[in-house]
Amino acid sequence: MWGSVAVVWAICLACIQPAVFPWILPVRSNKDRPRPAHGALTEKVECFSDYMTLQIPSSHVQGLKQWLVGVLRLPGSKRAPNHLDSLLTKCGYLLHPAHEGGFIFRALYSGCFVQKEKANYRLEIRMFQKGAKRLKQSDRYIMRCPMMVARLGEQSVRCHPSFIQVSRPWPPRTDAGQTPWLLSLRGELVASLEDASLMGLEVDIGATMVTIQSPRQELLQRQEVWNTSLELLPLWLVSGSYAYSFEAACPLVSSQPGSEISVHIPKQRLGLVKRGSLVEESLSPRFLQVQQTDTFTVAEDRDFVIVSIPSMRLLQDQPCQKARESPGTQAFYRVDLSLDFAEMDSPVHWTVENFFQCVGSREDSLFSTVTPRTTLPTQSPGWETTPAETPPAASPPLQTPQMAVLEEPPQHFVHQSAKESTKQELAAAFMQITRPARGSWVSMASPSSSAMQEHQGPQTPPEKADLSPHPQTPATLSSEHTEVSQAGPGPSHYVSLAPNSLSTHLSSEITSSLWPSWPSDGPPMLLSSEPSVKLTEVPRATRAGQDSIQPSRSPFPPGELSRETVNSTESTEPIPREPAYIREEFPPFTKSFMSSLAEEGLIFHPDPKRPQERPIVKAEKPLQNDHGPSGEETRHYLDLSTSEPSQEMKELGVDATFTTSRRRQPDARAYLGTSRPELTGRPRVGTAALQTTLHKGLLASTSERPAAPSEGALQLESAPSWPEGWHDLGAAHTASPLSSHTHSPLVPTQAMFPGSDEPGNSLPGSQGSVESRLLPTTDSHQSPEL
């Protein structure tokens, strides 16, 4: 009996010992155990489309910062970072004050230390206790959010002359206790979806989509972006701490489309965001794809990403729906594009439809598309590109040299395509990107032609480019379609705008055409690709020796003023996989022709007080005879430069080789849009007797092939050197825009090179790649987040 009582007492003592006598049998201390932060535990993690947030009490903010400083310290460095905010941004974190006191800690799902745990995002954070220095003396908290299956990055905008309509996926509920969605206009007026008619809105709620229609006259806000007026619908859906954007921008109502179509995309997240946030977040465009065309211009400012496309590539027409008396037509267009921001996990898909007012005929609706704009914005920063994919070994690269950024708006050069009847047409691309004065970025890319792809068969993979700002090296990169009037959908084109990326690739199926052409009084010009006149380059050493004794302003050697005419003969031996080209060497024009050009306004005289940007375009193409005297392959370099002539080449003429295509070339006046007297003094090429007139001294030089260098590959460089008074003519060839081409409202004046429809301007190119290195922008484009 006494034994059982002793057992009972022993059990009781063992139970009460830790509470009554802690000093008798000490157990493990609780000091080293992490304790949850009492203030943080009362708050709940809020999950949004791209990030999760947690409200931190003021008493724990310093402890959280101490932990962040420790985990974000560089490896091997014992010093704490001086600028914590910059490190937080790079790591996908954000710590900012809240309305009701305390702070809001936000972490992107793609941020540092965020792990994917089954179907959840998980982040473990710690908050040091006051005065603690060891990790064991910290409070731990785990942030966890489920992965959202619904893709909310889609928006469709329909711009009608009388209303604006926005369609978006229906936002999912994050929890069972979420309040119903309400309409918020300008962040002030709030109404339920059932009372939307009181605000003048029409709401259509489907199974997966929500469509809201607003009249243009009442609720829209007028806004100026790049000297362009817009009508903005500042509409949001709000519920508790969540907000869902229905903002959309449409151009002003017009009956005649302009030369370019601009799509304005707000720089904001399209998913669920935190409502009422004071954060002004900066989103960085990284990737862009336009579905309908491969020629477009990209720019951005603080609030918008602007994509501009030539009107002729998108415009369509339809009969007016309300036309009763007259059969009028209504012009419209549709643009589908994808835009990816560096701070978002998935790209946004944007669709814009715009309908113009009805007009009497199709010609009236498209009249303004052939008229270039007169108002141009300020200059923009230069971009360069590097190939992201390895081009074929047989395709020579098209190199774009660096040019310094000028304070004055630089001239931009648009490179247009020219068709060639080869089985596999080699391509080269240009892309023009400049920097506006406000720190925006402009990118013009047109890598391929849909008309050429129809002849080529299967399309090549879509082009991709990583573009990043470079404050000092603008590069010229652009190209145009072969048929300007073609408005059908074309292949997709990708432009990547990576702030930290240093590589890009542009694959284009377009050949170069660098020399303009004008009509003249001679016989009609019919060019054939079958006859071939083989002309070799005059060696630079030989020409320099002849130039040393020739009189001033004379493009020919002294004592040899006679001319010889070389008649072309039909080529009897076909060249496999490569057509025969008509090659002719153009001597310099006469002063009388210069005077006529000056009277016609086709020559630009640069201001001597301002520096002029002079681009250099180098194209590499094999000669007609692909093997030199040594039997090794010979490559030909063509250098078309508008810079001042060097001392040794001061008096030499242009000795570049050009090729022409086999079809009737249209009159350039059809593009100019005005009746202009034809210029005289132009060389003529007929079909019966195709002739190339050269100087006797030059013919003597062409009969000899220069010796190949020891490296094996013969490299000939043909750089046009302008005699006195001719540098303005060279500038006119590259800086005189044709009225048939349109100017971007986002870039400075662009001088258009002639397209493939003009005679004598086909420069055989190859599938090219362009290289560059870009630096990230220092400007901060921030957008308020509701």
From Swiss-Prot:
The question of whether ATP-binding is a record keyword is answered with no
Is Signal set as a keyword in this record?
yes
The free-text tissue note of the record is: Expressed specifically by cells of the ciliated left-right organizer.
Q: What superkingdom does the record give?
A: Eukaryota
- Tell me, what is an example of a GO biological process annotation in this record? heart development
Cleaved signal peptide residues: 1-18
* Coiled coil ranges: none
Keyword line: Signal
The protein's matches in Pfam families, at most eight in alphabetical order, are given as: DUF4556, ZP1_ZP4_Ig-like
Annotated protein name in UniProt? Ciliated left-right organizer ZP-N domains-containing protein
Organism of provenance: Mus musculus (Mouse)
